[in-house]
């Protein structure tokens, strides 16, 4: 699993926190950030540079004109797919944790209100 990331020398893909991708001249710059260890100020990161793929395509369907376009490298595309899987998984785990905490807070509120209601009913019974 994560063969493309491992081919970059990333031995523990599960430690990836996030990534950034930007275009600089004729290259794509990929930075991969790892989770910080306790006591570290900055997260460890690695940087990779990929040349953009050049293609010549027909400029329009009518004439004989051609134009050159640049695209992301196919290898980089596969790496981004793997990074998205890792980062989406982390995001969904955080969302699930937030949902569970919200459910607990709601349950706590419902139970507190029910206890107050029962205590009020008991108070009415003891007054008679």
UniProtKB/Swiss-Prot annotation:
NCBIfam families per the UniProt record, alphabetical: PRK13677.1
HAMAP family: UPF0325 (MF_01519)
Family membership: Belongs to the UPF0325 family.
Protein name (record): UPF0325 protein YaeH
Upper lineage: Bacteria, Pseudomonadati, Pseudomonadota, Gammaproteobacteria, Enterobacterales
């Amino acid at each position: 699993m994560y063969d493309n990331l491992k081919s970059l020398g990333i031995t523990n893909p599960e430690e990836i926190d996030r990534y950034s991708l930007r275009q600089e001249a004729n290259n794509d710059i990929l930075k991969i950030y790892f989770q910080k260890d306790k006591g570290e100020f900055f997260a460890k990161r690695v940087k990779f540079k990929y040349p953009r793929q050049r293609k010549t395509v027909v400029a329009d369907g009518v004439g004989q004109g051609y134009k050159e376009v640049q695209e992301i490298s196919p290898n980089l595309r596969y790496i981004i797919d793997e990074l998205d899987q890792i980062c989406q998984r982390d995001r969904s785990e955080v969302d699930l944790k937030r949902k569970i905490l919200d459910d607990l807070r709601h349950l706590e509120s419902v139970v507190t209100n029910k206890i107050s209601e029962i205590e009020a009913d008991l108070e009415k019974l003891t007054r008679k």
